């Protein structure tokens, strides 16, 4: 084996030289140079600096502006809450442990950090699924005269919590476990060891299929059908400038969403699956650290895509920051860009 396994940890380095130490008790500077740990801490600080304001502002602006309290925006708010979970309970912990060079908070802290990081990530991922399904049902109309209302939104939000807890909870209850990963400064599910006493392999397979492949498939299906529907509508109404604009806006949003999803999550999932299928092989600590930390940047990408690209949200944010005035003068224009398209007409194709 090219790693060192101990109680509640796995260090991706052989202990033949005797230098490997418990990542809960000693700095891990034999895995990487101190400046690399400092770079991770600086990166996490940047994510906190960007992620907290934009997600908190999303919640604050929605509470302040009644016109934003629409069923579809419940999902957007849930997305912001998920990102705040990641920022407050995951990023802050990882920043501090990176500054110290090891997971200073012990096994209990590792379980807490791993749980909230996984919970936040899964809540965000399943929120994207609910948004994709909502867009598909409203625009593609597989059910005629369907109106996405408050009840549907609350059901969607509840589903994101149920699915997130179904992924983040089992390692705390004895099905798999959370351990330090990569450079040992953040915690995640144990992909590294079979650990039969906690049925680790079955949980990783379950997590990969149910909580990664399934949502990815749903998102691609829904947005793929959405693009086809918009193109078909544009072909039937060649002279409709509104439809042409809707096609461009929806297509742009879909492309950005898909790219950001792939950039954030596929590297992490791919590396995790490789480690799981090649347990005991030789790979360095940075091999898992880079994709794991990069996946955390989804806390910034998501609100940019689903909120800042929406004129109504954007203008309300500007008005809040500018004490009720919009220096861009788009108040009236923004009113026409409806976030609540899912609650109104079923006869038009409308971008989110």
UniProtKB/Swiss-Prot annotation:
Region called Disordered, residue ranges: 332-352
InterPro entries the record matches: GPCR_opsins, GPCR_Rhodpsn, GPCR_Rhodpsn_7TM, Opsin, Retinal_BS, Rhodopsin, Rhodopsin_N
Entry PTM: Contains one covalently linked retinal chromophore. Upon light absorption, the covalently bound 11-cis-retinal is converted to all-trans-retinal. After hydrolysis of the Schiff base and release of the covalently bound all-trans-retinal, active rhodopsin is regenerated by binding of a fresh molecule of 11-cis-retinal.
Compartment(s) of residence: Membrane
Residues where lipid is bound covalently (S-palmitoyl cysteine): 322-323
One biological process term in Gene Ontology: phototransduction
Positions where N6-(retinylidene)lysine occurs in the chain: 296
Gene Ontology terms, MF aspect: 11-cis retinal binding; G protein-coupled photoreceptor activity
Ranges in the topological domain labelled Cytoplasmic: 62-73, 134-152, 225-252, 309-352
GO CC entries: membrane; photoreceptor disc membrane; photoreceptor outer segment; plasma membrane
Residues exposed to the Extracellular side: 1-36, 97-110, 174-202, 275-286
UniProt cross-references to Pfam families, sorted A to Z: 7tm_1, Rhodopsin_N
Site positions per UniProt: Plays an important role in the conformation switch to the active conformation: 113
Membrane topology annotation: Multi-pass membrane protein
Disulfides per UniProt: 110-187
Regions of compositional bias (Low complexity) in chain numbering: 337-352
Major subcellular location class: membrane
Glycosylation site list: 2, 15
Gene3D superfamilies the record matches: Rhodopsin 7-helix transmembrane proteins
Tissues of expression: Pineal gland. Instead of the rod where rhodopsin is generally located.
Listed transmembrane segments: 37-61, 74-96, 111-133, 153-173, 203-224, 253-274, 287-308
Motif ('Ionic lock' involved in activated form stabilization): 134-136
UniProt keyword list: Chromophore, Disulfide bond, G-protein coupled receptor, Glycoprotein, Lipoprotein, Membrane, Palmitate, Phosphoprotein, Photoreceptor protein, Receptor, Retinal protein, Sensory transduction, Transducer, Transmembrane, Transmembrane helix, Vision
Family per record: Belongs to the G-protein coupled receptor 1 family. Opsin subfamily.
Cited function: Photoreceptor. Light-induced isomerization of 11-cis to all-trans retinal triggers a conformational change that activates signaling via G-proteins.
Name used for this protein in its record: Rhodopsin
Organism: Anolis carolinensis (Green anole)
Gene name per UniProt: RHO
